[in-house]
A protein has these predicted regions:
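Mid-to-C-terminal alpha-helical segments outside catalytic/metal-binding sites
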Residues: 1-6, 18-36, 122, 201-203, ...
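Histidine-centered catalytic micro-motifs
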Residues: 3-12, 102, 128-132, 160
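Conserved, mostly hydrophobic/aromatic
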Residues: 7, 29, 55, 88, ...
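Active-site gating/metal-coordination segments in enzymes
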Residues: 35-36, 46-128, 134
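Conserved residues at the C-terminal ends of beta-strands
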Residues: 40, 100, 207
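Active-site-proximal loop/turn and secondary-structure-junction residues that shape catalytic pockets
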Residues: 43-44, 72-74, 101-103, 133-135, ...
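Catalytic pocket-lining loop regions of alpha/beta-barrel enzymes
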Residues: 92-95, 106-205
């Protein structure tokens, strides 16, 4: 059974006062027998280009195990934004793009957010969006109009509204939009069981966010009495299909 963690970070963050070293990241991956991990900078990275380049180096160091995700502040010139996205996806092989609502102070409905959706559509890669902490920008419901406007774009709600804050709203968003998938880091095991049971295991993906949380997220799904098929879907198969991973 493959395990794919679609939400890992590398480097420092000035917004949330966090710092995940390569040693901490790879230690959690190896200790928890993760087959592949999607890695991105924190929103408060003091030098985001350096961190993206560090992730690209990790991809070469750990081929078929580490995959990069683009995470750029959308509040910049559109040509500059697109040029960096193009470089990372075309030249470095990154497999997704993130819109960090709270970290970059942006609503999914904002004018500057459209370039993020358009970039994901153009490159045919999934778009991940931070939800939960950071209201009003991080409301899961704000993604609904954009998911309907981009029906062929897979959109993953990181945190699924987060720890009872807006998890029900994330569920409603996924219920209304078949192209919305839920990543459940920091929500409870009861919510995870509910999502799998009601939405179907094909709509849920594993993400852990921080090395300290890796074992917890995996254990919750393994202790949820899911069928072998449902567990395999959530832990890895869905991510492999969504991101077209060759592992």
């Amino acid at each position: 059974m493959k395990i794919v963690d679609i939400h890992c970070h590398l480097g420092p963050c000035k917004v949330f006062d966090l710092d995940t070293s390569e040693e901490a990241l790879m230690g959690a991956i190896q200790k928890n027998k993760i087959d592949a991990a999607l890695v991105l900078p924190f929103p408060g990275a003091p030098d985001v280009k350096k961190i993206h380049n560090d992730i690209a180096k990790l991809m070469k160091k750990y081929p078929k195990k580490i995959f990069g995700v683009v995470s750029l502040n959308p509040h910049q010139d559109e040509k500059e934004y697109n040029a960096e996205v193009d470089r990372l996806i075309k030249d470095e092989g990154f497999v997704g793009i993130k819109l960090h609502t709270i970290g970059h102070a942006i609503s999914p409905l904002a004018t500057d957010a459209k370039k993020v959706f358009e970039a994901a559509k153009r490159h045919k890669v999934p778009l991940m969006i931070h939800t939960g902490a950071g209201i009003p920008f991080a409301l899961p419901s704000l993604v609904i109009p954009m998911a309907k406007a981009y029906p062929d774009l897979p959109i993953i709600l990181y945190h699924s509204g987060m720890a009872h804050i807006y998890s029900t709203e994330a569920y409603i968003a996924a219920k209304l939009c078949k192209n919305i998938y839920l990543e459940g880091s920091w929500i409870s095991i009861n919510e995870k069981i509910w999502f799998v049971g009601d939405l179907g295991s094909e709509r849920i993906v594993l993400g852990t966010d921080l090395p300290e949380n890796t074992a917890v997220e995996i254990f919750q799904y393994r202790s949820a009495n899911l069928s072998d098929k449902d567990l395999a879907n959530v832990l890895g198969e869905n991510a492999i299909k969504l991101f077209k991973l060759k592992i």
